[in-house]
Amino acid sequence: GGPGAFAVTLGGRGPGVYRSLRYCVVGGGISGLVAAYRIRAALGERADITVFDPADRLGGVLRTERMGGQAVDIGAEAFIARRPEVPALLAELGLAGRQIGTTGVRPMVYSQARLHPLPADTVSGIPSSAASVAGLVDAATCAKIAAEPDRPLRWQSGSDPALGDVVADRFGEQVVTRSVDPLLSGVYAGSAVGIGIRSAAPTVAAALDTGAASVTEAVLRVLPGAVGGPMFGALDGGYQVLLDELVACAAPRWVAASVRRIDAQGPGWAVQDDTGRTWPAEAVVLAVPASQAAVLLEVPAPRSAASAAQIPVASAAVLAMRVAAGTPFPPQSGVLVATGEHLHAKAITLTTRKWGARGDAELLRMSFGRFGDDIARSAADDELQTWACDDLATVFGIAVDPIEVVSHRWIDALPQYVPGHAEMSAQIRAGLPPTLAVAGNYLDGVGVP
C-alpha cells in the first residue's frame, strides 16, 4: 500500500493547507477517518467535518470483533511494520505502545495437495534462484529458473506488464501458480495474470528500469537484507483501537447515510444524502470504493469518473473461528493456497500461531473469494462454515468443531491493480476540481499500508 490514505490533497495543495470550514467526507473507512483527522489537525475547531457512511459502524474494511474474550480483526488484520506510515500515525496518535508484532513463524503453501514451506529469498514470490522454490516446482521449472539469467531480456523502461506474464515467460507457469499467486491472492484476491508488475513488485520493476540484465538479477538487487523486527504489525485490541482514536481526535459529525450526488454550488458543493437532505461544503473528500466514486464523480468530474469506472474489483468473505484450545494445528502461521487446488479457501490464518496466544482460545481465520468468482456474494454462512471445516480436514487432517464463528463479507472491496493502474490513478486525480479530493485503496495501494 502507499501513503495516499494518510494525506489528503485538495487542488494540488499539500496536506494541511485548507481555506474553508465545512468539509464533507464521503466514506467512513480508514481513508475517510484519516482524512477527517488530518483536516481537524490542520484547522482545529474552525473545521466543521461531516462523515457519511451508512454502515453499522465506522471503519470500512477494518472491523474488529470479540471472540473468546479476545479482539479479532476480520477485515485487514496487519500492516507492514517495516514501512513508516502506520507506525508514524500510531505514534502521532499516542498509540505506539499498542503496536504488536508477529511471532516470527512463517506460513506454508498448499500446492499439489501437499503442504510446502513458503519459499524464502523471493520478492512477491518471484524466485532469486532455483533453490528458493525447490520442492515446490518440478525439475524442468527449476532448470528454467537456473537458466533465466543467461536468456536475453526484453524490457521497456516504464512499462507495466502483468506480473504473471513476466514470471511465466522467464521462470515458467508453475512459479506463477504455486509461488506468486498464493501471495497475491491474499492481498488483491486476484492472480498475477491480472496484476501489473509495478503494483505487485515495484522494486523489481524499478531494478529492471535501471538496467538489471535479468529478472533474477533484479530480484537479487532488491531482496531485503537482514532487517530487525517482524515484517507485519497489528494493534493490541485490534484495529478498533486505531479507529476509535481517529474518531475521537477528528470529532466529526457522523451521518449514517449514503451520498446520492454531489453538485457544484457557488464556489463550493452541495452534497445530497439518500434521505434527501443537502449539506453545503467548501470541500469534499470522496473516500469510497472506486465504483461508488465513479457514480458520484459523474457530474462534478466526468473524466475522473470514467477512469474510476475502469478499475475492476473483487469480493471476499472472511470466517473467523474459535476452536478448542490445544487443537493440534502445525506450528506455522497459516496456509496460502496455490491456484488450481481443490479447496474452497484461498488462505488459512492460524491467528494464535501468528500473533501469539492471548488467552486460552485457539483462533483462526479462513478467507474465501477471488476475482471473477461470486463466493462472497452467493455462499450462505453455513455453507462457508462447512467449506472451512472440510478444508481444515483436507489440509491438516484435523476434524474441527468450532465453538464460535463470526463472518463478514467485503463486497467489491478489493480493487485489481491491472497493468497501467498508476496511469488510471493519475487520470482520476488530474480530472478533479480544486476542492474535490479522492482517497482510498484503489489509488496508491491496497494496504493500510
Which residues does each predicted region cover?
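Mid-domain catalytic core of redox enzymes
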Residues: 260-378, 382, 394-395
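Glycine-rich FAD pyrophosphate-binding loop
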Residues: 40-67
